[in-house]
Amino acid sequence: MELGQRFADRRAAEPCEAAPTANMKEAAPTANTKDRLTRDEGHHLLTDAPLLEVGARAAEARFARRPDKVVTFVIDSNPNYTNVCVTDCQFCAFYRKPGDREAWTLTVDEVLAKVESAATKGATTVLLQGGHNPALPLDYYLTLVRETRTRFPQVTPHFFTASEIHTMAQVAGLRFTDILDRLWDAGQRTIPGGGAEVLSTRVRARIAPKKGGPESWLEVHREAHRRGFKSTATMMYGHVETVDDLLDHFDAIRELQDMFGGFTAFVPWSFKPGNTLLEKWIKQYKGPNMYLRVLAAARLYLDNFPHVQASWFSEGKATGQIALHFGADDWGGTLFEENVHKAAQYVNTISVDEIVTLIREAGFTPAQRTTEYEILRTY
């Protein structure tokens, strides 16, 4: 059956409702689920459906949800506070074990200097992540949040992935929900979606066994959304996963989004094997065709996600422009600083002026946004 026939009657979901406030405990469905895509249809999108038709359908879904031609971006930076990690992920070239001569950990003041540097360049978001360092006390993290909020009120502290939050809890002898409560009290309101990789038990056991199964990531975001946090959902594909694993990932985050509507965007990117333990088996990362297929399929399958991000940094600027015609409505960030992909021998840089130019060249109107997708300026 042709793709157009398969999805002729599909309609984009209504816009997501607001995420619940901190005291809301009941589920808050965010989409009309009666006519959403099935796993079989998702499998078709990710395998044998003609790529350009998948892209065209995804573009229709994008404009059904957001009729204007605005493409947003955020001015941000992505520094790291430590490369010390005890998790030994097979895909990571960035980490060093405790005691390694190349291991480092920044002081609170050194991290805040990076936040200040980003703020002086106009950043409104700092995405701060690091390794799982058992030597760092909980107060280190809470101080970073409080000081960022106090000293740089224009900057959103988009700090600490789910696995880092689990590490904080283990070191402090607390529950991860206690950590979420303390981060909230310190002033944090958003959480990055990194560390999801592919939410498949088989895949995570192969590439990141010490991180636990999919639930270890999902439970943090579930409880964060219950408390009123917003977060992103990411996916790093192109290593040991199958199409069924990708669909497991889609199903898991779609189901969680039905509960609270706390995800602001879906952000996929391809694995970069350079300098990693997986490099011996995976010599080359996936190309643009696979990226565009995954992106477009996500726009169609994740009917309750308000935004899909074009990962220019990992996939290249030209692919980022094409992604805007395959369902993406957000360009991502400036990433003034980024070290994880750099460690895998993959480097890409961009300026605000270049972002504006690239979005316009693709036929869209650029608009600067906040972490939570509020428009600050239209160009």
Which residue stretches match the model-derived regions?
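Active-site-proximal loop/turn and secondary-structure-junction residues that shape catalytic pockets
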Residues: S77-P79, H132-P134, T161-I165, G195-V198, ...
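Conserved SAM/AdoMet-binding glycine-rich loop
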Residues: A123-H221, H225-S231, H239, H307
